[in-house]
């Protein structure tokens, strides 16, 4: 009604319904409600978004041994496995300890379409392709870890993320914008709705860029969430 969203239409097992609300919060992750309501947005950087991922966990791991290898050693093993016929598109991988004994979380995949282009999370077909390719890639990295990385010899695939991990899609144009410089400078806000110490990540064609704050954090201003 005018510039105010009064509710949303949904489809479920009982058919089509209207859910009315005093306030509507878009928690879709892709700005679906905002865009359908006409809010301005951008899509990635110059139309290019980051690669998706699919995280999984392995158990029965010798965690101390498995996590003792540095990045260069892991990348060398990936190169060796590729020469042997493995399909391992991501070289810079992260193996992280879990609170559970003998378990490691594996953030190692890079999910693309068959032509190498990133997954467009606003398209149902792309999401389906990503789910299929992601789960196949999980199995390939599982096979690689068991064969090449000491500590994983007896490991088993424990579980896989329930859905594709999307790093980037639409960005709604808010009343304010959280910028890279805000993160670099660890800027605080009088209207913060959250604080974060998580790094800037960029997973694209040029490789992986990550920037970590040193014992500091930045705020996410309320205004960045208002279209």
Language-model regions, residue ranges each:
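Flavin (FAD/FMN)-binding glycine-rich loop and adjacent Rossmann-like elements that form
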Residues: 2-3, 7, 11-23, 27-227
């Amino acid at each position: 009604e005018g510039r105010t969203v009064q509710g949303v239409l949904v489809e479920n097992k009982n058919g089509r319904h209207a859910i009315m609300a005093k306030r509507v919060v878009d928690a879709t992750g892709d700005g679906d409600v905002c865009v359908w309501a006409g809010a301005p947005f951008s899509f990635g950087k110059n139309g290019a978004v980051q690669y998706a991922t699919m995280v999984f966990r392995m158990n029965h791991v010798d965690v101390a041994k498995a996590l003792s290898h540095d990045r260069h050693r892991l990348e060398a093993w990936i190169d060796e496995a590729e020469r042997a016929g493995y399909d391992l598109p991501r070289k810079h991988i992260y193996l992280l300890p879990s609170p559970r004994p003998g378990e490691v979380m594996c953030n190692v995949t890079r999910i693309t379409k068959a032509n190498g282009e990133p997954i467009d999370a606003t398209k149902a077909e792309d999401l389906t392709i990503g789910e299929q390719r992601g789960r196949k890639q999980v199995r390939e990295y599982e096979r690689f870890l068991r064969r090449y990385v000491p500590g994983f010899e007896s490991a088993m695939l424990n579980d896989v993320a329930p859905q594709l991990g999307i790093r980037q899609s639409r960005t709604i144009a808010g009343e304010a914008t959280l910028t890279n410089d805000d993160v670099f400078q660890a800027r605080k806000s009088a209207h913060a709705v959250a604080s974060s110490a998580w790094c800037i990540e960029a997973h694209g064609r040029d490789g992986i860029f990550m920037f970590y704050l040193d014992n500091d954090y930045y705020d996410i201003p309320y205004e960045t969430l208002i279209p």
